[in-house]
Every structure is written in C-alpha cells, then in structure tokens.
C-alpha cells in the first residue's frame, strides 16, 4: 500500500511538472518545491529515500513506467515479449533516446542509449561491490551478470531462474533506471552528486540540505498527446526546509508551487468554505 501511495504521488507530481506552461511574456518557468528531508543520493542504485526517488525520477528513465492508473507502460522499451515459460523478457528499445550531455561523452554530447547500458545498469543492482539498496528487485530471480543480455544495440533480454508473473511491474522502480557506464566509472561514488541520465531534467546544482536545481533536458525524447515536446518547464528548484510550518509559510507567500503533507490545522488558511484555494 505504501508503494501504491508513493506511485500515485509521483504521478501527480510528474503531471504537475509536465503540464505547467510557459507564461505569455516568455519568462523562464521554474517549478519550486520543498522536500522535508535531504536526499541520500541522486544515483538510482540508491533510490531508497522517498524524496530522492521523486528527484531521480526527473533525471532518469527505465525500460517501463507507470501511467496515472498505475498500469505498466512503455518508456525506453517501446515493446517487450515474455517467453511462454516465463523465464525470459525481451525488450525492444527506442532508437531516439540519448543520455544528457556530459564532458565525458564525445564532443560533450550525450550518446544514444543501448541495450549494453541496461545490462550494465541492472548488474549494478546485484553487484556486491556496489551494495545497492535495490538488489531486492532481482533477488532470487536472476543468476548473475549473464542474466542480463544485450542481444544487439536495441534488444535487451533478462533471463530469470524461475517465473515471476509480476516481474514487469518491478521494473518500474526507480532503481531500474539506465545509467552510462563511462560516467559512473569515472565519478565512482561521486556519481551520487553528478548524475547523468535520460530524463526530462538534467542535473545542475546540489548543495546538500539547502537546494537542488535541475534544468530542462532539451533533447528529451517524450512528447505529449498533441505531439509537443516535453517538459514544458525550464527548471525545477527544490529546497530542503524540514520545519513544516516554515515550509507552509513559504507556500502561502507563493515561494513554492507545490506543497504536500499539509497539516489539517492549515486547512482554513488555504481553502474557502466552498473548497476553493484562497
């Protein structure tokens, strides 16, 4: 139930982030949110903190994702097939997904995501040297690194040791985001604060316990139902005020665009008797 509630919140937050439009005067559109706890890491392999999951979800993508009804939908994988015996899952990847620009890539331009990237990313979750908190995703389900196979650049396969009907749903977890091997290996443990993914926003700045800034990924691959490029926002700015009253005052002053976990005692400060925002 806790996971379902978290997924629902993430979907609501994503909807808000993607649906905000630019002002008529073409000002930069920044989404301001407060997180009541600091992040533990921006590395998907350690996405165990609720707030980290929300922010990592802006920077990274996986094979699949959930829609507003919590149905598993395509993301970087455009289609997939499950073997009749339930022991292998084969994913066909999009060919228009690129990692965000980084100096470690040729000419500083993000390269195309391949099946090899997923094989590397998923093995990280079970690699004892990494000690990922997401190892449970594949625990007792895969054998070792040989379970993650890049059949070619655009076809990725996972081999299970036994059938697990809900397996595809597990892959929507933020732990299962794709990361670039060369960047992770270059930064090592510092990848936690130098993340490079494929998501709608790219990392800009993080001062722990104070502020996190993400900028629009101009090369993001997803579009809305009308074919318009997402995201519509130019940036996301997260502050880390752990005192709820102080954070709520910032919301009332319109310094924040989104506020969650509203205490019932604040209801009259933000809602009229008819239920409208004051």
What kind of feature is each model-predicted range?
Residues 81, 117, 130-181, 207:
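Surface-exposed binding/hinge segments that line
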Residues 78-130, 247-250:
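Aromatic- and charge-enriched surface segment that lines or borders ligand/interaction sites
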Residues 34-84, 123, 130, 196:
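N-terminal lobe/hinge region of extracytoplasmic solute-binding protein
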Residues 29-40, 78, 88-92, 118-121, ...:
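Short, well-ordered beta-strand elements
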Residues 100, 159-177, 192-246, 267-278:
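Aromatic-rich, solvent-exposed beta-strand/loop patch
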Residues 21-23:
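Bacterial signal peptide processing site
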Residues 16-19:
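C-terminal motif of bacterial Sec signal peptides marking the signal peptidase cleavage site
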Residues 118, 154-156, 247, 252-261:
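Alpha-to-beta junction loops
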């Amino acid at each position: 139930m806790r996971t379902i509630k978290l997924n629902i919140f993430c979907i609501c937050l994503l909807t808000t982030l993607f649906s905000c439009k630019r002002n008529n005067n073409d000002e930069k559109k920044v989404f301001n949110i407060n997180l009541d706890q600091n992040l533990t890491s921006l590395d998907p392999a350690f996405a165990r903190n609720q707030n980290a999951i929300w922010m990592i979800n802006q920077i990274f993508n996986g094979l699949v994702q959930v829609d507003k009804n919590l149905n598993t939908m395509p993301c970087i994988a455009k289609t997939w097939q499950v073997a009749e015996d339930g022991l292998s899952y084969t994913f066909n990847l999009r060919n228009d997904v690129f990692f965000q620009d980084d100096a470690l890539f040729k000419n500083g331009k993000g390269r195309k995501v391949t099946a090899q990237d997923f094989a590397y990313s998923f093995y990280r979750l079970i690699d004892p040297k990494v000690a990922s908190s997401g190892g449970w995703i594949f625990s007792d389900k895969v054998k070792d690194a040989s379970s993650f196979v890049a059949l070619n650049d655009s076809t990725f396969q996972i081999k299970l040791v036994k059938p697990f009907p809900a397996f595809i749903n597990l892959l929507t977890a933020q732990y299962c985001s794709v990361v670039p091997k060369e960047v992770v290996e270059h930064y090592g443990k510092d990848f936690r604060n130098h993340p490079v993914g494929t998501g709608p926003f790219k990392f800009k700045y993080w001062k722990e316990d104070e502020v996190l800034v993400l900028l629009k990924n101009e090369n993001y691959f997803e579009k809305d139902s009308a074919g318009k490029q997402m995201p519509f926002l130019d940036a996301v700015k997260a502050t880390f005020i752990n005192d709820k009253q102080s954070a709520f005052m910032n919301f009332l002053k319109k310094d924040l665009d989104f506020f969650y976990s509203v205490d019932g005692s604040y209801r009259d400060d933000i809602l009229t008797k008819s239920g409208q925002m004051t």
